[in-house]
Amino acid sequence: MHIDARLEEASSNLTYLDILLRFCKNLKIPDDVENSVTEALLLILFIWAESPFYSTKRNMEILCQALSSQIIEQCKEYIKLDVALGNNPEMGIQMLEKCIFCCNVYRSIYDNVMVNVTCYINLNRQWDINQQEVFSKINIFQQRCYDVIEICKALIVFGRDAKIGLIGGPNGTEYEAYLREIQSLFYENLNEIITARDIVFDVTRSIWFIKIKQFRYMDLQLENMVVNLINDIFKNIKNIEEGVEAIYALQKFKERENLRELLQKKWIQVWKIFSSEIEYCYINAINQSRKETDIGVNLLCILRYLRNQYSIVTNALDWIGDCDFGNCVLQRYEHVVDVIDERRKMFNIYSTNATQYL
């Protein structure tokens, strides 16, 4: 009699579990996460409500954990690490963000279903499953996704070929060699991650924390090296054109917040050079004497020079962006150009009148 009861229980459990198993094998994760997760959770509630033997708290907890594991496995299949850590980190970031979103949707649907549906199934029973246990692996997996996104962003900044050769001057070759060294060190760091690729999304392996900690430490060292490079480059910048060319060559470093702030400061440095040029030209124009026969030509040359400098900085605004200091410099530029132009016209009139009386 005892054996018959056990057989009946086993048969019943297998019937219900087979329904869930067949469905979970065909989950459309992450593409159709909302419908897939909703149906899977409703099947679990169906087992909870209808199964005479399997509907215990512990068994329901195991089923929910199994669903979490299945979602993670399908997300892992969706993520192409070769792509993310290879030649297309941007696509890798998109895949990882989609999986993070998928996990968030799963959590949201779980909360909604378990709060709004269970109360209508059986008023005498309460769904008291430990939610922390259900989502513990999901939380770890999401953090691993964020970790890999961090690595992808570092690859965008420090990897690939750099356009450092656009920087002119006698030290251009030296700067390029230094950047190649940074790039080489980055790939050494990245290879440590690629070698450990099997543990990246293995939520049971805590050794990943050591790997990502080591990566972040080296990543910070590389960032400091780039800071030193940028500062060294701009120590030797003497004119607007060199400054704009340098910022253009270093554009990819704007993807990193600290480096973006540093490049913004260097952009202000370029504006300060322009401001100094404006003041120098203004003083030069004011000091032009009527006794000089070529004063009109001199003032015209000053105007053309300033307008050329203006053209260089304003053309760069589209891809560098403006700044408050730059706006002030532009106001000063407009004033100085107007003053010099009026002075040029005045001297032209004076020169014409003086010639008539000769």
Question: Where are the language model's segments positioned?
Answer:
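Extended, acidic/polar low-complexity N-terminal regions with helical/coil propensity
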Residues: M1-L358
